[in-house]
Design a protein with these regions (language model features):
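Hydrophobic alpha-helical segments that form the core
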Residues: 5, 10, 14, 119-122, ...
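An amphipathic alpha-helix adjacent to DNA-recognition modules
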Residues: 31-42, 46, 74-98, 117
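Helix-turn-helix
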Residues: 44-80
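Secondary-structure edge/capping motif, primarily at the C-terminal ends of alpha-helices
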Residues: 97-105, 131-137, 187-194
Length: 219
């Protein structure tokens, strides 16, 4: 007898996991306080770096302009603020990534590779992403969320390739996950010393992914 899927298994990653909030703000004023804290933290990360945020709670508190009580009502620590920032970044990216996939013509499977590479390159041009992901300034919580996010994206990429059936009938979610992990590492490499991304590395990433998926295409 087949095992029934649980409701939890059907949820996307950000519905199964939380960010860094101690509790969800309910009132409009509370939501404004949370947004104020997150905006200040993002600015501080970009201006002074990851270490400045987690190394001095006072520095972050001064930048936010909110009271200590209001801050700790929603966040246990500066690290949890960054957890929430990263959580929202990944959640927003998941939505816009899906929009990019949905907008493709669907005539050639190579379009999927182009969307992947172009999307990752554009994401890494964001200062916050470069400071946190490229420099690997991620908490253990965010690393776990990142794995969930990549697995989710792998499923979305597989769905796109399945539209070219039967050509990619042998392609699996694991294959797509491997490709995404490789692309993430190459994007980090491309943006380590170049805020616009080293075009040669980006081109090689495109070539590698094209050849990788071509190797999994049926005759």
């Amino acid at each position: 007898m087949p095992r029934s899927r649980s409701r939890t298994a059907d949820l996307v990653w950000y519905e199964r996991a939380d960010g860094g909030l101690r509790k969800q703000p309910v009132q409009e004023r509370s939501r404004a306080v949370v947004e104020q804290i997150l905006e200040a933290a993002a600015e501080l990360v970009q201006d002074s770096g990851f270490e400045a945020v987690i190394g001095s709670p006072t520095l972050l508190l001064d930048r936010t302009g909110v009271s200590r009580g209001s801050f700790y009502a929603f966040f246990e620590s500066p690290e949890h603020v960054l957890d929430e920032l990263c959580y929202r970044q990944m959640k927003d990216s998941t939505a816009t990534f899906q929009q990019a996939l949905d907008a493709r013509r669907g005539r050639r499977w190579n379009e999927i590779v182009d969307i992947l590479v172009d999307y990752y390159a554009e994401e890494h041009r964001t200062p916050l992403v470069r400071e946190l992901w490229v420099r690997q300034n991620l908490t253990q919580r965010v690393r776990a969320l990142d794995e969930l996010c990549i697995d989710d994206w792998a499923g979305r990429v597989l769905d796109q390739f399945r539209r070219h059936a039967p050509k990619f009938d042998g392609l699996t979610r694991l294959h797509c996950s491997v490709a995404l992990h490789a692309l993430e590492r190459l994007a980090q490499f491309a943006f380590t010393d170049d805020e616009d991304g080293d075009p040669a590395v980006i081109d090689q990433a495109r070539l590698m992914l094209t050849q990788f998926f071509a190797a999994h295409a049926g005759k």
